[in-house]
């Protein structure tokens, strides 16, 4: 790769395997993203790392394209990475947990289950163990970024292990964790703020670019899957398919019907929130469906996205309002003379939030957080569609004549009406039935006996009742118009 020959990088030495981890138990680690590493070069929990970089000449656009191209992998090396967020709460009061309580949980996990701490300005802000990490979202949402795994059995085992560990430590502190897409009870002012530098910059910037950005930061939880591609053409097909079907996944996994103690008018308020968070960096990316689309076109898109920050001398420098294109030519007033490294590019790509996101893999970002069975079901659903050639081709054919207007309509209406959203001569539920069958077929052909993980999705589609509608029914009947029982209903 061109970039490899032009950057001399001082890298952190390996940790010496399991024995080394035991020696350093509970001590901070630093993860260094490099252009040559596989999935997850940057650890989600970490502050950005500062490589000792001697630039022989500035990065070019070709280097940025090459960074994305380096994600291409032969099919035998494709992996499945799952990320999921959850709300911590005090079992006695149902109140959101504060940073001090979260710090105690992180310390407890580090001591008891051999995780390494990640520290920013003397605050524990995450954990790392092998290729897994635990990080904190702005309002203290607890996120597991899973390791890249080969099968969905491994994925579900990882989810279960994580939930077991978090529950074991949390229960002793009177803390529970809730699997839902939007905070059902508490106002924005009730949510604690995590001590992470990048979030302070985002918190100040969000109200300038949309009315719901702070809700996105502090009151939402999602589950997403990260999947590989073999070539530019494979990436394009998967990107287009993922975007077209993202509203269908939003409907199936809709699980955020409450806000501040009552129904909010949506089945997936979390999904709706993204429509007025920051339209410069979110949405359905119609240009992905242009004939000219490829890695270079995505780089052009990302270059013009306003930046959030640059990380220098262990500090976040607020660069809001400037583009990465400005940075490429040294035109950041906040960091005069600074030029970007690949680290800066990698960090910038994490501040773009479309329904499907391209890094050196593709992220499917349309689903609400939910209980553990749905955390396993979401990656299964997408793997059956995108990792099987026959299913992927069938979906590509099915969606090839969908217009931008139709895709935008689904994106807009599904958060309100879910599976009952009209589409052409039927409903989203009809589409979901067809897509589910294609996913099952793809899983059968994979040959790992993974179809069973789709039972939860099967039940939703066959009944036509989304998880959110089930909760709304409980609210009106058994719960006597109180949201408090949801904390028990969706407790991990």
Swiss-Prot record:
Instruction: Give compartment(s).
Output: Plastid, Chloroplast
Give one GO biological process term.
glutathione biosynthetic process
Q: What class of enzyme is it?
A: ligase
Q: How is it modified after translation?
A: The Cys-156-Cys-376 disulfide bridge is known to modulate the enzyme activity according to the redox status. The oxidized form constitutes the active enzyme.
Q: Name one GO molecular function term.
A: ATP binding
Q: Which reactions is this enzyme annotated as catalysing?
A: L-cysteine + L-glutamate + ATP = gamma-L-glutamyl-L-cysteine + ADP + phosphate + H(+)
The cysteines joined by S-S bonds are 156-376
Question: Where do transmembrane segments lie in this chain?
Answer: none
Subunit: Homodimer or monomer when oxidized or reduced, respectively.
What is the protein's given name? Glutamate--cysteine ligase A, chloroplastic
Native organism taxonomy: Eukaryota, Viridiplantae, Streptophyta, Embryophyta, Tracheophyta
**Which gene produces this protein?**
GSH1-1
């Amino acid at each position: 790769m061109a970039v490899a020959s032009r950057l001399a990088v001082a890298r952190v030495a390996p940790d010496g395997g399991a024995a080394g981890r035991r020696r350093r138990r509970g001590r901070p680690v630093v993860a260094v993203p490099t252009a040559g590493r596989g999935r997850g070069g940057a650890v989600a929990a970490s502050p950005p790392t500062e490589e000792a970089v001697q630039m022989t000449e500035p990065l070019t656009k070709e280097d940025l394209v090459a960074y994305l191209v380096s994600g291409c992998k032969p099919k035998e090396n494709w992996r499945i990475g799952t990320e999921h967020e959850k709300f911590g709460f005090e079992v006695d009061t149902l109140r959101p947990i504060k940073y001090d309580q979260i710090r105690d949980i992180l310390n407890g996990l580090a001591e008891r289950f051999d995780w390494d701490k990640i520290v920013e300005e003397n605050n524990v802000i995450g954990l790392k163990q092998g290729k897994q990490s635990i990080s904190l979202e702005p309002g203290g949402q607890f996120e597991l970024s899973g390791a890249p795994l080969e099968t969905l059995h491994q994925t579900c085992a990882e989810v279960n292990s994580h939930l077991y560990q978090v529950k074991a430590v949390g229960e002793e502190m009177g803390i529970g964790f809730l699997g839902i897409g939007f905070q059902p009870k508490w106002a924005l002012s009730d949510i604690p703020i995590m001590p992470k530098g990048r979030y302070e910059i985002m918190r100040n910037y969000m109200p300038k670019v949309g009315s719901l950005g702070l809700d996105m930061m502090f009151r939402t939880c999602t589950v997403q899957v990260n999947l590989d591609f073999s070539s530019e053409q494979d990436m394009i097909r998967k990107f287009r398919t993922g975007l077209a079907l993202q509203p269908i996944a939003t409907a199936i996994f809709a699980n955020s019907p409450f806000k501040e103690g009552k129904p909010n008018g949506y089945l997936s308020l979390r999904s709706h929130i993204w429509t007025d968070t920051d339209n410069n960096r979110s949405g359905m990316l119609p240009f992905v469906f242009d004939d000219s689309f490829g890695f270079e076109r995505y780089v052009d898109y990302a270059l013009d996205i306003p930046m959030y920050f640059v990380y220098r001398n262990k500090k976040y420098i607020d660069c809001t309002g400037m583009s990465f294109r400005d940075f490429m030519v040294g035109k950041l007033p906040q960091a005069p003379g600074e030029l970007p490294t690949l680290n800066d590019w990698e960090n910038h790509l994490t501040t773009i939030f479309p329904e499907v996101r391209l890094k050196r893999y593709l992220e499917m970002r349309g689903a609400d957080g939910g209980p553990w069975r749905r955390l396993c079901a979401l990656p299964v659903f997408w793997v059956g569609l995108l990792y099987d050639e026959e299913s992927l081709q069938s979906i590509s054919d099915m969606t090839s004549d969908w217009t931008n207007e139709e895709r935008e309509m689904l994106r807009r209406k599904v958060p309100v009406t879910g599976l009952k959203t009209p589409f052409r001569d039927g409903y989203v539920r009809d589409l979901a039935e067809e897509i589910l069958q294609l996913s099952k077929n793809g899983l059968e052909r994979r040959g790992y006996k993974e179809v069973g993980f789709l039972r939860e999705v099967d039940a939703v589609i066959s009944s036509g009742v989304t998880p959110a509608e089930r909760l709304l029914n409980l609210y009106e009947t058994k719960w006597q118009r109180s949201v408090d029982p949801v904390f028990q209903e969706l407790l991990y």
